[in-house]
Design a protein with these regions (language model features):
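Catalytic-site signature of metal-activated, phosphate-bearing donor transferases
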Residues: 63-64, 70-71, 76-81, 88-253
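Conserved donor nucleotide-binding strand/loop of the catalytic core
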Residues: 28, 42-72
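Cell-envelope/extracellular polymer assembly enzymes that use nucleotide-activated donors
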Residues: 2-4, 29
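A conserved acidic beta->alpha catalytic loop
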Residues: 22, 26, 34-46, 82
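Short, conserved structural micro-motifs that define repeat-unit consensus positions
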Residues: 1-2, 9-13, 61-66
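Short, well-formed alpha-helical segments that are part of the catalytic scaffolds
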Residues: 6-25
Length: 265
């Protein structure tokens, strides 16, 4: 099949085997872009037939990494997976049914079901969480965002939305949640600040409180039980961290700019 499955990794030996095993029935090429793993990630991936390449020193952020991996793909059609994601038999069958007739300008959106401590999260705004992951690289590619990257839709694009979800086992334990969320707020804040976004410090508590209300009440997180309450509280802290990072990154950029302006006088 003229398709490459792309997986980004960094010390993912706990996940990579199951991820690649779930993708093998597609019969696609598999490309793993690894960022200096010190565990068995790369050896496991190679043993399963994947081509493994390293992230170059100058490539930073998730968007640029995905774009670099795409540039090394042996096919125009690419499917992106994270190491903690799994393709189900039903999703494989659905993908196989659409691939033969997929147009070049089509972008495939796949619903994603995330598990938190073993509980599927179907509310909180986390489902169906459709991700644009399958596309022809001659038509589009991931944007350059450092985090929360996405695939833009050029004019004339056709979005094909699948029914069966990708399973996302991102947070089996409490420490996994905090570890994965740790770098995202900083990357998000730097990215937004570099694009000219700013926020007031006094607004941050209100943003965080509103995000809790939106997640737990408006998006019915209470229907996910204790996991929904835990996630809503954690998301409130995550939202505060994002905007604190934006506030600090904006101050640094503005101070540097003022210093440059004064130096020209």
């Amino acid at each position: 099949m003229d398709l490459t499955v792309i997986v980004l990794t960094c010390n993912e030996e706990r996940n990579i085997r199951q991820c690649l095993e779930s993708a093998l029935p597609l019969g696609a090429q598999i490309l793993v872009l690894d960022e200096h793993s010190t565990d068995g990630t790369c050896s496991i991936a190679r043993a399963m037939g994947a081509r493994v390449i390293d992230v170059p020193a100058g490539v930073k952020g998730f968007g640029p990494k995905r774009r670099y991996a795409v540039s090394k793909s042996g096919t125009d059609l690419v499917l992106h997976l994270d190491a903690d994601e799994r393709l189900t038999h039903e999703l494989i069958a659905e993908l196989k049914s659409i691939l033969p007739s997929l147009e070049r300008d089509s972008v495939v959106a796949i619903p994603r079901l995330t598990y938190l401590f073993g509980t599927p999260i179907r509310h909180c705004g986390w489902y169906p969480d459709r991700k644009r992951r399958l596309y022809d690289r001659s038509h589009t590619d991931f944007d350059e965002k450092l985090v929360h990257e996405d695939v833009p839709l050029p004019e004339g694009s056709r979005v094909v939305t699948l029914t069966h979800p990708l399973l996302h086992y991102s947070y089996p334990r409490l420490e996994d949640f905090w570890r994965k969320q740790g770098s995202y707020p900083v990357l998000w804040g730097r990215d937004r600040a570099s694009r000219g976004k700013r926020c007031m410090l006094v607004s941050i508590p209100f943003r965080a409180l509103f995000f809790f209300i939106k997640t737990y009440v408006i998006r019915m997180g209470f229907l996910d039980g204790r996991a929904g309450l835990w996630l809503s509280i954690a998301n409130m802290g995550y939202e505060a961290s994002k905007y604190l990072s934006l506030y600090e990154a904006g101050r640094e950029i503005d101070a540097k700019k003022r210093g440059q302006d004064e130096g020209r006088r």
